[in-house]
Regions:
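A structural signal for small-residue-enriched, beta-sheet-centric alpha/beta enzyme cores
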Residues: 1-109
């Protein structure tokens, strides 16, 4: 029973990791959509793009914290390494993009 319980916990932790990881992917995708709106809106709507970039930045960071907490309990090193690497890659793209969007909006106001 202990082995079955441990196996079930490992499976649950992996599934729990995939949810915030998918949120990270969606945040990055959303940031690219927000970026496409730069320069294509009036000033009033432009501020909404800046707010969106801030919200998406905090969402991707929060999701990353959830990924990390779940990875900490997973014994499958290949899984841990894969999602740690993939998550870090998303962060390396998303955080500068969110900052770029925000700063461009800020300068345009």
């Amino acid at each position: 029973e202990k082995a079955a319980r441990k196996e079930a916990m490992q499976k649950a932790l992996k599934e729990a990791t995939l949810v915030p990881y998918s949120i990270m992917e969606l945040c990055l995708e959303s940031l690219t959509v927000v970026e496409m709106g730069l320069g294509c809106t009036n000033t009033n709507a432009a501020s909404d793009l800046g707010v969106a970039s801030l919200n998406l930045k905090s969402a991707v960071q929060g999701a990353w914290l959830n990924v990390l907490i779940n990875l900490g309990g997973i014994r499958d090193e290949a899984f841990v390494n894969e999602y740690r690497t993939k998550g870090e890659e998303i962060l390396q793209k998303a955080l500068p993009l969110a900052d770029k969007i925000y700063n461009e909006i800020l300068q345009s106001l």
